[in-house]
Amino acid sequence: MRKSVLTLLLLFIAMMMQAQQHLITGAIIDKGTNDPVEASTVQLLRADSTYISGAISDENGLFSLQAPEDGSYLLKITSVGYKPTVRRIMMTQGKDLAMGKININAEAIMLKAATVTAMAKKVVLKEDTFVYNSAAYRTPEGSTIEELVKRLPGAEVSDDGSIKINGKEVKKILVDGKEFMTGDTKTALKNLPTSIIDKIKAYDEKSDLAKVTGIDDGEEETVLDFGVKRGMNKGLIANMDLSIGTKQRYSERGMAAYFNDRNRLMMFASANNTNDMGFPGGGGPGGWGFNKQGLNASKMLGLNYNYENKDKLKMDASLRWNHSDGDISSTVASENFVSQNSSFSNSRAKNFSRSNSWDGRFRLEWTPDTMTNIMFRPSFTIKSSDALARSLSAQFNADPYQITNDPLEDAARAELGLEDVSLSKSLLQQAGALVNLQSSSSISYSESENLRGMLQYNRRLSAMGRNITVRTDASYGKTDANSLSLTNAYMYLVDVANGNETDHYNTYRYNVTPTRNYSYSLLATYSEPLWRATFLQLSYKFTYKYSKTDRSTYNFSDFSDEEANQWASITPEYRGWGNYLGTLRSPLDEYFDSDQSRFSEYKNYIHEMQLMMRFIRPKYNLSFGAMLQPQRSNFIYDYMGQHIETTRNVTNFSPTLDFRYRFSKVSNLRVNYRGTTSQPSMTDLLDITDDSNPLNIKKGNPGLKPSFTHNFRLFYNNYIEKHQRALMTFVNFSMTRNSISDMVTYDDKTGGRTTQPENINGNWNARGAFMFNTAIDSAGVWNINTFTTLAYTNAVGYLSLDGKTSQKNTTKQTQVGERIAMGYRNNWLEVNLNGTLNYNHARNKLQASSNMNTWQFSYGPSITATMPWGMSLSTDLSQSSRRGYSDKSMNTNELVWNAQLSQGFLRGKPLTVMIQFYDLLHQQSTLSRALTAMARTDTEYNSINSYAMLHVIYRLNIIGGKQARETMMYGGRPDFRGRPFNGGRPPMGPPPGGGHRRF
């Protein structure tokens, strides 16, 4: 009885205490722009400044907190870049207090006096969205948002320039939540100036279909959403960047943008021949061979337009023109794991290329009422590409570097020895190590046109979530390609026992290949609420795909020596096959080769039926289901003198599960699983032997089975506001059953390969990562960030030698990566100590001598300083090292120093003169190594890494308000205000790699 009374008493006291809690609410607003201020700190203090409670304003500036009792209090509001605001409030009669809008003023005077009490937070988490504050990341003057993204915690930049955030590749860029240059992330990353960006949000965006239906179609994309600074999203802004560099380098950009309440228009222009290297200084340790694959010149014109009429009509449009010229030289050395003994190969190649492309995309979303949504997405692409290539390659049955320092030069002596018997045999030939030598050249050209369109209609049938969607997609494409290839091959171990020195053959061919394809589909979905926040979702989709390729091949391999020598004397040039064909002694049709010509026609009829269950709860979301995909394919194939007509009927199965749990508004757990079935290609299933290239023979396999891949991902994030501490971890796992691998039969006499696809089990990989970012002190002046990755790959493949029993080769690879940075920042200075580590442990079953236990690490400081008189300095020094390679030449040290110095001029510093220095010590290399189950490959490219560049940058703000003009005048940064935009102009004269290219 006493326990019951005590329990009731405690309950009554708790209820009384709760009843006495008074709620205080309000909205924090920027007085100059009337925009809400996000992430402001709101503190409730007693009259003697004793802390009681606190809160953080949300993205709408709203906050709420509780007062314990009636009385007089102080409400203190602080936010980075604003003056502290204190209000005296009185709580009476137990009533709540609604304060409405609370205006706060920008801290312009304090900034000029260089008085800052707290630094901007680097990252904040809101459910499954990462919000990065651009003011917390110092980038070099004039830089674009690519430089900003590289500095974000959890960001990874690959060798091809693609960017991953938290382990997922970024597929789309948004600006203020609106689509920007859809389908092209690099245009935004390399052209939007950092000076206009306020915050960056990283999250997974669902597809158009999933947004309106809730049905997960597996088309989720990772996006970066760049928010424009307050006051800069209205009016006209522009900037221009003109430059000149040593070694004929240039990198120019231009940008103009117009904003008002409904319209947003941006135009870009850029031209450079620096491989889009970006800006030196402040970047920290770099990678090996990153973005230095040859010499590349590019030009771009882009236009992006957004329109929004409240919630009724939204429109996004983009148009882009790209031109590129490439001049790429590569040297490759490979060890191929063919069996217990390796095969070695070396090659040198010279490639020239140029391309032009137009890409246009449009999106119209109309919401005529609260129950209806209509969306239309048309797009087109027009592209033309030219290429010239020349290469020399050789294969060896022993490590050639044990015999000679330059294997290709020595192998070329063997070819000359065939014509001049007075020359001695090459060292490789004397040792019996030279298997074959190939020299080849080619000219190719292609032009393509593609049209696509999507129309989607969604209707909500009730407020409970019942809805129906109808969608249709259609596409049409055509490609016309021409290519001329000339190959001379020498095989040195064939018939040696019979006294022959070598076997030699030529392959001269001209191909004309038109391709046509089109497709259409019709989709219907229905979502039924079973009970509160629980939905059953059904969908059906029919797709028809058609494609036809009709390649005509003309064979000149039976040329006489006189004809072959005549062709060898012609200098290749773009689309210059007429220079060769014009010398033919017979009409072109007489060289038509029906066996080498190829015709194929596909007709695919695909049905997709999906059933999903979806549960929405305050703490978690759960959806699971499966898709069944019956498919019928009709295939007609004419090749190698065979005519084949076949039909295949298969059924694919794809289960899916997505679970999200919310621990709090800043802490989430997500588990995702998707299984997919994939079928072997129709050509792989045909019992045909393609020996058109005697050194690369391909066979089909009618017995191939479909493969099934399991993909699993676990993701967790958390944020501790008090310590400005963010952490993220993820685990990815993928395993494929009956994956398709090429079984390679190696002929040690010719160096040729016969490949045939086979099913194999054992391919799987796992990757995990952990990101931790925290302020060390309460003001956020000191910060540390670490990003750790661990990956394991089990790669399998088939190998056999001279037709003997095939062997299963396994390469087990463990990779550990670490990127750590510790930094100090104040109003005018940021100093970072950066370090990276990559450890690679690999074990090869058939080739123990090819095992790897290597280290790549780099470390060094980066500094960014801004002076009161408008001068800015950015520099980084990085020592990059390799260790553990059996080839001692790979164990190198590279000390790379980059720097940039700029000075602002005129009132408000709209004019900036800047000088940049890349690789001041001339030590950066372009050598890289790759390892698979089949081979180890070392590649080195030509590049220009060390040069200097002078920039003159001017920025303009015509219509924007006072705050926008101030922000533009001072470069958009909250400190000594000197960062300009980044832009450009087209170069004067043709860039290297362009024009009428000849060898």
Could you say what each language-model-derived stretch is?
Residues 32-46, 125:
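Short, ordered, surface-exposed loop/turn motifs in non-cytosolic proteins
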Residues 45-50, 72-88:
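A short, solvent-exposed loop/turn motif at the edges and junctions
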Residues 22-30, 61, 100-102:
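A short, amphipathic beta-strand motif
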Residues 320, 359-367, 371-383, 431-636, ...:
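Face-selective signature of the C-terminal outer-membrane beta-barrel domain
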Residues 20, 60-62, 76, 82-83, ...:
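Membrane-proximal, glycine/serine-rich, low-complexity loop/turn segments characteristic
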Residues 280, 289-295, 328-336, 343-355, ...:
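Extracellular/periplasm-exposed beta-strand and loop segments of Gram-negative cell-envelope proteins
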Residues 37-38, 64-72:
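Short Pro-Gly-centered beta-turn/loop motif in secreted/extracellular proteins
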Residues 47-62:
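Short, acidic Ser/Thr/Gly-rich low-complexity loop/linker segments typical of extracellular
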